[in-house]
């Protein structure tokens, strides 16, 4: 876990911040494909030079959401 410790802290922060604007863990009501699409959008925005958010952190969070939902079945 050591190499990923800082990255996981950042993902946890994104989740905490998201909980303030998206109550009730509403992300679990979406399917994995939705979160994959949102991750792709964050990566596209980063490639296009957008700096309004930390798009890599948000993309990583969305990928972990998709993985979690896939594993929960």
Language-model segments: residues:
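Intrinsically disordered, low-complexity regulatory regions
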Residues: 1-73
